[in-house]
Amino acid sequence: IYDLKALKKSPKKLTMTNPANAEEAKACVEAGIDLFVLGNKEIEPFREVAPTHFMGAASIFAQFGSKSEIIDDAFDKMRRGADMYYTLRSFDVMESLVNEGIPVQSHIGLIPTFSHYCGGLRGWGRSSEEAMKIFETIKRMEDIGVTAVEAECIAEEVLDSINLKTSVVTFSLGSGSSGDVIMSFVADICGQDSEEDKPPKHAHAFGNVGKLIKKVHKERVSALSAFNSEVKKNNFPYPETNISMHPGEKEKFMSKLDKWTPVHQ
């Protein structure tokens, strides 16, 4: 947490992404990614492959009804290896978590969970009025002790203008390069979307994992189809895949088999 806050006075940028499983986490570690956000996942498998990485964990918005349940969940995740707790709940809940000594991350700008009554999935802060609302929100979070925010799809001029006016660490997701940490999703970075999908504006594919996954799937279907076909034609198992008795043992076995009688009648 101390190192994150020190980014405000440094030109250094850190990277953050959201591995979905231990395999993706291992790839992130090997690639040098600095920070993980795990969401509402089990933490232990990620800690096995990334024991020293900074990891944020979360509860989904409607997972718990009461403040006490949220606090209990936050403590549980911290015990299991989380370094910070993400929540979209009220300022009161955030402040209560802070008062318990839990580093809190929240969210400003586009919040997909609430997009259905905020004009859909769109850019935020494109008007001066909305930009001021974003600034006032992050300052309110600062006042209650929030450590960090995900700044999603905010006009780059806005984050550039407010980032040094707050002590809250900013994780920029589609909000320009002024964030203290630059975040993107593993699926977007690796190009896991299919050609038919329309990725969000802020997404940039640095790889072609989606095409490779499709190729692997096609190859898997081809192999399974060939197996199914060969069995149905009575061609498989092939002679070279079978096990044979030692020379002369079949004759002995057949002789014993012919002479066999039940022990119990």
Task: Set out the residue ranges of the language-model regions.
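Alpha/beta enzyme core
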Residues: I1-Q265
